[in-house]
A protein has these predicted regions:
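Core dinuclear metal-dependent hydrolase active-site scaffold
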Residues: 5-9, 20, 123-150
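Conserved beta-strand hairpin/beta-sheet module of binuclear metal-dependent hydrolase folds
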Residues: 2-60, 147-156
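Active-site HxH/HxHxD metal-binding segment of metal-dependent hydrolases
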Residues: 36-130, 218-219, 224
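Active-site neighborhood of phospho(di)ester-bond hydrolases with catalytic His/Asp-centered motifs
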Residues: 32, 63-72, 92-94, 138-140, ...
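Active-site environment of divalent metal-dependent phosphoester hydrolases
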Residues: 14, 37-39, 72-77, 98-101, ...
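A contiguous binding-surface segment within folded domains or other stable secondary-structure elements
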Residues: 143-188, 194
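Accessory terminal helices/loops
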Residues: 2-5, 180-193, 197-262
Length: 262
């Protein structure tokens, strides 16, 4: 059975966690949810965080074959475009990205949608080395949310947080769909490892980047194994009404959909 080395990278400014997943037999690897750095005051994009990933790749002599995004991020700028150009590898996103683009095109006066090399659908598969990745569609946070299953590891984007969930109030978001997506993940065995996209620790040494399906089924404050859809929707929508929009929502969506920054 194929095995993988999973290395996480934490971006404190946005609370985002990126991953490099390498097939141990062949050193072929993928990057999931990389981040670019954005100085709001100076309106400058830089790539120190992406360079950390490149340094890791070089140190371990990995061969990157793909960059994958779990969804269109609204709280940070993606490092995918920079890494794709630097490493000469394709970017894989959800087919739902097209819907997100349509919802925001006029409001944000967006230029053309970036020509992503691959638009992924439910149950698609890809291999890197001897490792096998399965695409699970998990809409709710946005229409574009995907979960990637590699062996007994899940990369869940913003569908699940540690003992919580992402918000569901963005255009095209749906608490009902999020509930259905999470329940689908809860059907997997309890020992399945869940690699998170966000965590907001007081300090980096308290970062939680991984949980399990069993732990979330028992301890998730928004949706445990006994929560009904009605209960979840009421709690999730109630919380979302209290939350302000992400500070970087406009520049993040523009950049992450078009690779342009105006």
């Amino acid at each position: 059975m194929a095995s993988q080395n999973i290395q996480h990278f934490f971006h404190p400014d946005s609370g985002t966690i990126s991953y490099v997943v390498a097939d141990n037999d062949t050193k072929e690897a993928i990057i999931i949810d990389p981040v670019a750095d954005y100085d709001v005051q100076r309106d400058v994009i830089s790539y120190e965080s992406a360079q950390e990933i490149i340094d890791h790749i070089k140190k371990h002599e990995l061969h990157i074959v793909a960059i994958l995004e779990t969804h269109v991020h609204a709280d940070h700028l993606s490092g995918s475009f920079y890494l794709s150009k630097t490493l000469n590898v394709p970017i894989y996103v959800s087919e739902g990205v097209k819907e997100v683009y349509s919802q925001w095109k006029d409001e944000l006066c967006l230029s053309e949608l970036y020509h992503f090399e691959h638009f992924l659908l439910e149950n698609e598969h890809m291999d890197f080395g001897h490792s096998h990745l399965e695409v699970i569609s998990t809409p709710g946070h946005t229409p574009s949310d995907l979960t990637f299953k590699i062996g007994d590891a899940l990369f869940v984007g913003d569908s699940l947080f540690y003992h919580g969930t992402g918000r569901a109030d963005f255009p095209g978001g749906s608490a009902e769909k999020m509930f259905e997506s999470i329940r689908k993940l809860y059907e997997l065995k309890d020992s399945t490892e869940v690699y998170l996209c966000h965590n907001y620790p007081e300090s980096e040494d308290k970062l939680v980047y991984k949980t399990t399906i069993g732990e979330e089924r028992h301890d998730n404050v928004f949706v445990d194994e006994e929560t009904t859809q009605t209960q979840f929707v009421e709690k999730r929508e109630g919380r979302d009404h209290q939350l302000p929009p992400p500070k970087l929502i406009k520049p993040a969506l523009e950049y992450n959909l078009t690779a342009h920054h105006s």
